[in-house]
């Protein structure tokens, strides 16, 4: 018989971060030639006390589409624009943290000059390589332009990687820019080796984030969500690994569930969501962090967890739909797998949720609609 569960709830969100995450609407206009054009947009958010001072940084995230690149050998008449290729699939590409931008509104027009190549490769998994060929000066201070390329699992940033085949050259065209200003003290993404570490001497603490999802009744996404409460709408559960706690060797001291639950309470955890490396869970420990958990937070008690790392499918759904964090639970489990299967979960339900920063609003742009119900984008220039 499987072990039973108990949990600890967290009541409100991390200050300076939202419990609502907003997505972009889609707008189409016609040019003088009568062709449909997808309106490019920029979203600017400021978190906490971030401003244009030296203490603030800026996260840049981009959303757009992948299409076949224009051939280098095509012939064109004078004044003729290159023929636009058909859009293959939607894509998100985070540029990461960078300097504080004084005039972010100008970045939208410079985004047209960015040239990004997209190629498939393979290791233990199918992978996608994004490489920069041309970058305007205003973007060069961000992480991705500094590195010049990034290699990720194919399902992490691309909606339908199966549409990319060997042979053609593909490019990524930016349609939406998302800039988030935040204090530099909040910049800390937990290294992957630390997140993957397991030990028999440890107990693992995970966070379960319950989100209310905003989508229409006929949306195909509803089939992947929890729909047992029609009055409150569909929900989704996302888990992230928060930290490990050392069991201890003192033979007299009792290291039971109550002991570890008390450790959770002492950390005074709070949770929010923002668009940083894509939709990102922000965790703030306002209280005492155990020594064994200190590697999972920066010196100010912050830790950022991109949903694209924890649940790529859920992250891609949040490109086009809204969400609101309604509940956060801390889960205590055995760290190594043998302890995990032999002991029940302990669940702590008192995690704070920032009421001002808990939602991701609904978007009219939905790259997940079936072709028969999707607006005709074949004639749209991107």
Curated annotation (Swiss-Prot):
Belongs to the morbillivirus/respirovirus/rubulavirus M protein family. This is Matrix protein. Its main location: virion. One of its GO terms (biological process) is virion assembly. It is found in: Virion. Keywords: Viral envelope protein, Viral matrix protein, Virion. One of its GO terms (molecular function) is structural constituent of virion. The M protein has a crucial role in virus assembly and interacts with the RNP complex as well as with the viral membrane. One of its GO terms (cellular component) is viral envelope.
């Amino acid at each position: 018989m499987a072990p039973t569960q108990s949990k600890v709830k967290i009541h409100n969100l991390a200050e300076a971060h939202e419990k609502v995450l907003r997505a972009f609407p889609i707008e189409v206009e016609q040019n003088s030639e009568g062709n449909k054009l997808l309106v490019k947009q920029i979203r600017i958010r400021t978190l906490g006390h971030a401003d244009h001072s030296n203490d603030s940084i800026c996260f840049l995230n981009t959303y757009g589409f992948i299409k076949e690149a224009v051939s280098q050998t095509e012939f064109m008449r004078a004044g003729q624009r290159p023929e636009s290729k058909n859009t293959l699939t939607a894509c998100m590409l985070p540029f990461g943290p960078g300097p504080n931008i004084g005039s972010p509104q100008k970045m939208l027009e410079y985004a047209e000059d960015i040239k990004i190549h997209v190629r498939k490769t393979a290791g233990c998994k199918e992978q996608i390589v994004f490489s920069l060929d041309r970058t305007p000066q205003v973007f060069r201070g961000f992480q991705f332009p500094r590195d010049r390329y990034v290699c990720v699992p194919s399902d992490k940033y691309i909606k339908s990687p199966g549409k990319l085949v060997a042979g053609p050259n593909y490019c990524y065209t930016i349609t939406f820019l998302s800039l988030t200003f935040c204090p530099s003290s909040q910049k800390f993404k937990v290294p992957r080796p630390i997140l993957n570490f397991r030990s028999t001497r440890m107990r693992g603490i995970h966070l379960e984030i319950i989100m209310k999802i905003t989508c229409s009744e006929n949306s195909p996404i509803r089939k992947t969500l929890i729909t047992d409460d029609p009055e409150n709408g569909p929900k989704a559960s996302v888990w992230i690994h928060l930290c490990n706690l050392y069991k201890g060797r003192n033979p007299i001291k009792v290291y039971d569930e109550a002991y570890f639950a008390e450790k959770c309470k002492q950390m005074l955890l709070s949770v929010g969501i923002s668009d940083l490396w894509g939709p990102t869970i922000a965790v703030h420990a306002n209280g005492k962090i155990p020594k064994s958990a200190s590697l999972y937070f920066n010196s100010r008690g912050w830790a950022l967890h991109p949903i694209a790392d924890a649940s790529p499918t859920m992250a891609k759904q949040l490109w086009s739909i809204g969400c609101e964090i309604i509940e956060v639970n801390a889960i205590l489990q055995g760290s190594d797998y043998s302890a995990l299967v032999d002991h029940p979960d302990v669940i702590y339900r008192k995690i704070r949720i920032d009421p001002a920063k808990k939602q991701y609003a609904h978007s009219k742009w939905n790259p997940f609609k079936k072709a028969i119900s999707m607006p005709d984008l074949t004639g749209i220039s991107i």
